[in-house]
From Swiss-Prot:
Function per UniProt: DNA deaminase (cytidine deaminase) which acts as an inhibitor of retrovirus replication and retrotransposon mobility. After the penetration of retroviral nucleocapsids into target cells of infection and the initiation of reverse transcription, it can induce the conversion of cytosine to uracil in the minus-sense single-strand viral DNA, leading to G-to-A hypermutations in the subsequent plus-strand viral DNA.
Residues reported in the UniProt entry to bind Zn(2+) 2: H254, C285, C288
This protein's name: DNA dC->dU-editing enzyme APOBEC-3G
Residues where Phosphothreonine is found: T32
Active site annotation, chain numbering: E256
Residues that coordinate or bind Zn(2+) 1: H67, C98, C101
Protein family membership: Belongs to the cytidine and deoxycytidylate deaminase family.
Stretch list, region Necessary for homooligomerization: 206-333
Chain residue ranges for the region called Essential for cytoplasmic localization: 1-62
Source species: Lagothrix lagotricha (Brown woolly monkey)
Residue pairs linked by disulfide bridges in the UniProt entry: none
Domain of life (superkingdom): Eukaryota
Cofactor: Zn(2+)
GO cellular component, one term: P-body
Length: 381
């Protein structure tokens, strides 16, 4: 039976928007799915506008006919598809689509190769369950772009889909932190990998290469089972530091602190032992080293191993910070050839190409290792 569409013409109430699009990663009692859509199209019909935007409301129920995604597909097929040559569809959704809806979206996109779809979701629904993780991967594999809503998209929805009475969008305090956690989690689920050029440029340990102002952190997690460290493949990925932004992320957040947020978010069992290994393009600054040491003291079931490509020495106190980590029982070392290769094989979208070391990689690694040991032994203050 063809689902009856409900196309909400009236803009969303502000309280409805804040309640349903609040991006706290774990939320209950949100049983309504809101789908704000925009369709940019090329058409031979001059009476049709080039941009159509509106809202569908659906339910998180066992009957997928009542899901907002199904309403949209039915509406689009009946109203726009016959007149469209090319269409760019964007969904801003409060929850990501279920496996059934993903299958229907995949069929739709396969039937209409000139239609593209971007799904930007405020939250991830049941992302720890295998079926829902598989649904997200399948959605991405259909060619749809899947992403987490960022500050600009929340503001865009506020401006275009909410009866805001000309009031500006006021983000909740935890929006940036929640966004970062969800973005990294989605990267884990979709098994995102780093671009090869990005890896080589940011992880090179050649001191003559300048301009690496960002910090990348690759991580993997193992837990101790019967005396053996067993990989937790669902917790493996890479993190980029959140740059400071006067609007969306005023304070910024270093990659190490994003990792601590993520470990807390995983809710690892206190009765088990875990080992987190991170390969980072810059060693931690003093402030991050202090916070990492405090975190490990509060979470004795977690061990952290740090291997850095370069020593971050642009701020005072970096030596003290490295020694603080060492005293906290965190092994810290400089990356060697084997670790660069491991990162290339594990975290980089290398398309089957082997790791090609840059000139004097081993020499730079040895020099940096000697410098790190001198710091940890408190030589030269």
């Amino acid at each position: 039976m063809k689902p009856q569409t409900r196309n909400t013409v009236v803009r969303m109430d502000p309280d409805t928007f804040f309640y349903n699009f609040y991006n706290r990663p774990i939320l209950s009692h949100r049983n309504t799915v809101w789908l704000c859509y925009e369709v940019k199209m090329k058409t031979n019909d001059p009476s049709r506008p080039p941009l159509v935007a509106n809202i569908f409301q659906g339910q998180v129920s066992f009957n997928p006919e009542h899901h907002a995604e199904m309403y949209f597909l039915s509406w689009f097929r009946g109203n726009l598809l016959p007149a469209c040559k090319r269409s760019q569809i964007t969904w801003f959704v409060s929850w990501n689509p279920c496996l059934y809806c993903v299958a229907k979206v995949a069929e739709f996109l396969a039937e209409h190769p000139k239609v593209t779809l971007t799904v930007s979701t405020a939250r991830l629904y049941c992302y720890r369950k295998k079926d829902w993780r598989r649904a997200l991967r399948k959605l991405s594999q259909t060619g749809a772009r899947v992403k987490i809503m960022d500050y600009e998209e929340f503001q865009h929805c506020w401006d275009n889909f909410v009866d805001n009475q000309r009031e500006p969008f006021e983000p909740w305090n935890a929006l940036p932190k929640h966004y970062t956690l969800l973005r990294i989690t989605l990267g884990e689920v979709l098994r995102h990998r780093m671009d090869p050029v990005t890896f080589t440029y940011n992880f090179t340990n050649d001191p003559s290469v300048l301009g690496q102002h960002q910090s990348y952190l690759c991580y993997k997690v193992e837990h101790l089972r019967n005396g053996t460290w067993v990989p937790l493949h669902q917790h493996r990925g890479f993190i980029l530091n959140e740059a400071s932004n006067s609007v969306s992320f005023p304070e910024g957040r270093h990659a190490e602190l994003c990792l601590l947020d993520l470990i807390s978010f995983w809710k690892l069992k206190q009765a088990q032992r875990y080992r987190v290994t991170c390969f980072i393009s810059w060693s931690p600054c003093f402030s991050c080293a202090e916070k990492v040491a405090e975190f490990l003291q509060e979470n004795p079931h977690v061990n952290l191993h740090i291997s850095a490509a370069r020593i971050y020495d642009y701020q005072r106190g970096y030596k003290k910070g490295l020694r603080r980590l060492d005293r906290a029982g965190t092994p810290i070392s400089m990356m060697k050839y084997s670790e660069f290769k491991h990162c290339w094989d594990t975290f980089v979208d290398h398309q089957g190409h082997p790791f090609q070391p840059w000139e004097e990689l081993n020499e730079h690694s040895q020099a940096l290792s000697g410098r790190l040991q001198a710091i940890l032994q408190n030589q030269g203050n």
